């Protein structure tokens, strides 16, 4: 991205001319607040309105590798319209989306100040959260949120997500920005605790993880057209297990480089020799007996209607994207239910001169 374009984007942000969000165009009657006090943050489907106030400019501009934490107040309203204000410490996080040349807004990490937490707060179960800010347009946030919802259907050992409508108030300059459509993500420790597990931080090979969950995860990544992951480097993967004796389960996250999301910056690594992220490539390890996939294929077939309905029923996506995505899903189901194409696609890691064993390292230096 050219420097002049970066400057233009920054000026647009701080003069309040960020493109109008998809959410702002939706009739609020279709998104009821609900009784937020009777459920946790991720038990609700409605878009949550929040306001972040503090030295927002310094927070968003601090994109160094060792970014500092900045005090930020998080405001939202309960069902009775009572405003709740919580103290937090926020900092930029991530790799690709953290860079100015890639995204207008960087992803944020939220740490709640426990001494300030109210018992009735919607966030009382949270100590940390990830906040995905809109990178280039709100519609891609919505698309990625739907991908998290797909994986939630596959297994509870998955990260939960909730859309949030964000207003930014810079208390130093008195400028406000928004609304922006973002996404709150469940923190790793909470996800692990919810499933009676703990994080596993040692490096493993794919074959050393739980076979059933790995196949479900790898086929899911194939479904969404995502190749930006690896077990070996924990690239967009977290590992969890009940104890040191249990085989680890791989949990995927960060799907913005998938074909089903279709972000404008998403490109497959050149080593995979793919034309675009819309071209699928199965990236599991070599399995020659296709019967080993039977249980996984049965699972995806059982979930087919539910997966399709996520897109059919979603009022936040436009009709063009809905139709193209349903067609993309049709291609997936045609593949897994045809023995010949299944063997060709899922047997790719066994191909001697193929790229099936390429390990995605991402932006890591180790």
Each model region followed by its residue ranges:
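Phosphate/dinucleotide-binding and metal-coordinating scaffold of catalytic cores
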Residues: 23-366
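Bacterial Sec-dependent N-terminal signal peptides
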Residues: 1-26
